[in-house]
Amino acid sequence: MTSMSHHRSLQAELETLTTEAFRPELAEIDQLPTLEIARLMNGEDATVPAAVAARLPQIAAAIDAVADRMARGGRLVYAGAGTAGRLGVLDASECPPTFNTDPSEVVGLIAGGPSAMVTSIEGAEDSKELAAGDLAGLGLTADDTVVGVSASGRTPYAIGAVEYARARGALTVGLSCNADSALAAAADHGIEIVAGPELLTGSTRLKAGTAQKLVLNMLSTITMIRLGKTYGNLMVDVRASNEKLRARSRRIVALATGAADEEVERALAATDGEVKNAILTILGGVDGPTAARLLEESDGHLRAALAAAPR
């Protein structure tokens, strides 16, 4: 195939994608007052949650499968290029401080490596082999999950990641913003959030990016809920790595137990600042070492540990 014919083929393919569609009614948007453009953009953004809601059954099924793998010691790996890759890295980076996960448990891979977070790496997204190499470096196992993220659903890096992972028995999820995408078809679980054409033609950092962020929020957050990383809606596995989080830790213990400040401080001191353990010492009436043992025996699930505490 000649270079010119390849470009024509690619152009024809892109023209079929909802995320690339041109909207003639917005052709003079640059002539509008700033407030009117803001209203238009806000209205566009408001349609995204409904598009996500239409795929909640598929999202929930993927989450249950991910949680099952992670409960066996597996990892959650996001793989994408450009905005999609950055969103995966962002979600992965928030898990250690929020849920006290090891940085190796939830991983974000972006085509072109860490420098691609701030600089476009030419050609990186076009390589399936690059994705395979990145995943090979992680020593992928059958207990792991790989989530390929691509607004178009055709990005070779994301598809290559899913294909490589699936061939090795890992669970695969394909998150796209176009219907009938190659990415969703390549994965065990396809999630296609069709939010419609963008305000700026083809700028998928807008509605598509918002949709992807909402889904990734669900994937990581609900998986962690299933793994016992929360107690109700409290982040009991939060890592108190700064003063704000230390204050939050004290508040979480107080909210979960109703204990006074002095008792909260004693409980945290007796458990080396571990929120979940501190709650267990107060509600379960056990000492720090016993709390640690009960939580270990309950795979970190606080409710199960409380049920097992001697009364």
UniProtKB/Swiss-Prot annotation:
GO biological process: amino sugar catabolic process; N-acetylmuramic acid catabolic process; peptidoglycan turnover
Further remark: A lyase-type mechanism (elimination/hydration) is suggested for the cleavage of the lactyl ether bond of MurNAc 6-phosphate, with the formation of an alpha,beta-unsaturated aldehyde intermediate with (E)-stereochemistry, followed by the syn addition of water to give product.
One Gene Ontology MF term: carbon-oxygen lyase activity
Name of this chain's protein: N-acetylmuramic acid 6-phosphate etherase
SIS domain boundaries: 66-229
Record pathway: Amino-sugar metabolism; N-acetylmuramate degradation
Gene label: murQ
Subunit structure: Homodimer.
Residues of the active site: 94, 125
CDD domains listed in its UniProt record: SIS_Etherase
Pfam families in alphabetical order: GKRP_SIS_N
Keyword Phosphoprotein: no
Native source species: Streptomyces avermitilis (strain ATCC 31267 / DSM 46492 / JCM 5070 / NBRC 14893 / NCIMB 12804 / NRRL 8165 / MA-4680)
